[in-house]
């Protein structure tokens, strides 16, 4: 092999090495670019995920805030409705109290009512002797119906007429606005107790009104709610 052949082979080897080096460099470049693109894509996706999570978190906060505000507004509305209902009930109670006060002004009707209240009290207590309290203004009316009340009670239970002692020392308070506008008041009726004071039947007009009103209160509130809903 002469020098020309050797030189030719060397050039071929150099070209081969150079070509292989270029191919390897190209492979490395392509691989590096692919890795870079993958890493870049991963970073982009991670950032997108982070943004989505932040958006969802803020969206949930907004929804929670809306629910809280709605609940507060709903509660405020309910409180207003309940307050309006309470005001209406109070006005109804006040109007009823005024009507009850008028009952004692009709002496004939009130006299019959007093007798009925006394008989009812006696039937509840079923005591042979009782103490009765009334308003000072009603004292003469009570005295006028005592005997007939005792007889009616005795006939109903087939017993001896009871002894009724009218308290002349302690009276029930006068009607509203009688003298002391800010003190206790009584629209009428009686309070009957056993002699030892252990059993008491409060049969005043105010107590009867309160009992009736408490029984009717659920029905009244139901009607008020239906009126508001309509």
From Swiss-Prot:
One of its GO terms (molecular function) is proton-transporting ATPase activity, rotational mechanism. Keywords: Hydrogen ion transport, Ion transport, Transport. The keyword Transport applies. V-ATPase is a heteromultimeric enzyme composed of a peripheral catalytic V1 complex (components A to H) attached to an integral membrane V0 proton pore complex (components: a, c, c', c'' and d). Subunit of the peripheral V1 complex of vacuolar ATPase essential for assembly or catalytic function. V-ATPase is responsible for acidifying a variety of intracellular compartments in eukaryotic cells. Belongs to the V-ATPase E subunit family. This is V-type proton ATPase subunit E. It comes from Citrus unshiu.
């Amino acid at each position: 092999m002469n020098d020309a052949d050797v030189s030719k082979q060397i050039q071929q080897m150099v070209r081969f090495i150079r070509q292989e080096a270029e191919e390897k460099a190209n492979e490395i470049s392509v691989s590096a670019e692919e890795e870079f693109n993958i890493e870049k894509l991963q970073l982009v996706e991670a950032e997108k995920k982070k943004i989505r999570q932040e958006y969802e978190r803020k969206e949930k906060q907004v929804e929670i805030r809306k629910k809280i505000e709605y609940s507060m507004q709903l509660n405020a509305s309910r409180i207003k409705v309940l307050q309006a209902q309470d005001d209406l009930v109070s006005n109804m109670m006040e109007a009823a109290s005024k009507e009850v006060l008028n009952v004692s002004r009709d002496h004939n009707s009130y006299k019959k009512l007093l007798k009925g209240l006394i008989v009812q009290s006696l039937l509840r207590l079923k005591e042979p002797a009782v103490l009765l309290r009334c308003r000072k203004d009603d004292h003469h009316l009570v005295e006028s119906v005592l005997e007939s009340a005792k007889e009616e009670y005795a006939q109903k239970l087939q017993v001896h007429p009871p002894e009724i002692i009218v308290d002349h020392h302690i009276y029930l308070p006068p009607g509203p606005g009688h003298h002391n506008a800010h003190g206790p008041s009584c629209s009428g009726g009686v309070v009957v107790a056993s002699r030892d004071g252990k059993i008491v039947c409060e049969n005043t007009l105010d107590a009867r009104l309160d009992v009736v009103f408490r029984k009717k209160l659920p029905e009244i509130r139901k009607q008020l709610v239906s009126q508001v809903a309509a």
